[in-house]
Curated annotation (Swiss-Prot):
Catalyzes the condensation of carbamoyl phosphate and aspartate to form carbamoyl aspartate and inorganic phosphate, the committed step in the de novo pyrimidine nucleotide biosynthesis pathway. This is Aspartate carbamoyltransferase catalytic subunit. L-aspartate binds at residues 85, 168, 230. The gene is pyrB. Heterododecamer (2C3:3R2) of six catalytic PyrB chains organized as two trimers (C3), and six regulatory PyrI chains organized as three dimers (R2). Its EC number is 2.1.3.2.
């Protein structure tokens, strides 16, 4: 059966329908159960990271290797023609697209991946994060993890805690879960880092329930998923960072009264917003969540590069 993601750019989670999201998740589950080490044999994929990354870059490159493809690229754009000689992003993508079958790209500028897609021809761009905007593959692994731990993506009570203003992961995840039914969002953040108005407006237009809170304690007993985020020092001025960095810290004692099925997730890296004593609780699932990135990203790459995919 021809798959709808073949040669499709993956720029925003909003570019994917519920059916397409479920296709990626089914493919990820199949690849987790049964590895396919030659599925992308002879394919070449560019890994173009214009912004620092550890987990996302290594996860993508591991995914590429485990599917049998080759990877080329860079993790320091200062040593590229774009960084040293002033080449435009459009020209850079126009050239790289002649070398490879797909391009995985992270960039600090919002909208950079969508711009790149205008110049990559038939070569799909996979957005690995563009500024504070979108991080669709993190969302796919988040969805995969929620489904794996809860057995569903409908009727989920999820709290998002911390930096909801600049945290692209929570923007994308909220938009994705809004495609499913009966979910309730609890947004817990200081005013300076509140969820953007456009996200709240989207939920209101879809008549999806959400509530705003200043305390984690009052909502823990209601939750299926507790999604923690770090305060992003690199996106704040020093005075703002100092004011909010320690406002929301999760300790094991905060999980008293939690549901048995509760899982604590975090896109990582964590700084001090989850204390290490939480790691030892049955609720901690953030390291397994990171590991699921391999399967979600394998699934996405397999789908954008295969006209037909039957696993």
């Amino acid at each position: 059966m021809t798959n709808p993601l073949y040669h499709k750019h993956i720029i925003s989670i909003n570019d994917l329908s519920r059916d397409e999201l479920e296709l990626v998740l089914r493919t990820a589950a199949s690849l987790k159960k049964t590895p396919q080490p030659e599925l992308l044999k002879h394919k070449v994929i560019a890994s173009c990271f214009f912004e620092a990354s550890t987990r996302t870059r290594l996860s993508f490159e591991t995914s590429i290797h485990r599917l049998g493809a080759s990877v080329v690229g860079f993790s320091d754009s200062s040593n590229t023609s774009l960084g040293k000689k002033g080449e435009t992003l459009a020209d850079t993508m126009s050239v790289i697209s002649t070398y490879v079958d797909a391009i995985v790209m992270r960039h600090p500028q919002e909208g950079a991946s969508r711009l790149a897609a205008q110049f990559s021809g038939n070569v799909p761009i996979v957005n690995a994060g563009d500024g504070a905007n979108q991080h669709p593959t993190q969302t796919l692994l988040d969805l995969f993890t929620i489904q794996e731990t809860q057995g569903r993506l409908d009727n989920i009570n999820i709290a998002m805690v911390g930096d909801l203003k600049y945290g692209r992961t929570v923007h994308s995840l909220t938009q994705a879960l809004a495609k499913f039914n009966g979910n309730h969002f609890f947004f817990i953040a200081p005013d300076a880092l509140a969820m953007p108005a456009y996200i709240l407006q989207m939920l209101e237009e879809k008549e999806i329930e959400y509530s705003l809170h200043e305390s984690l304690e009052e909502v823990v007993p209601e939750l299926d998923i507790l999604y923690m985020t770090r305060v992003q020092k690199e996106r704040l001025d020093p005075s703002e960072y100092a004011n909010v960095k320690a406002q929301f810290i999760l300790r094991s004692s905060d999980l008293t009264g939690a549901r048995d099925n509760l899982k604590v997730l975090h896109p990582l890296p964590r700084i001090d917003e989850i204390t290490t004593d939480v790691d030892k609780t049955p609720y901690a699932y953030y390291f397994q969540q990171a590991g699921n990135g391999i399967f979600a990203r394998q699934a996405l790459l397999a789908l954008v590069l295969n006209a037909e995919l039957a696993l």
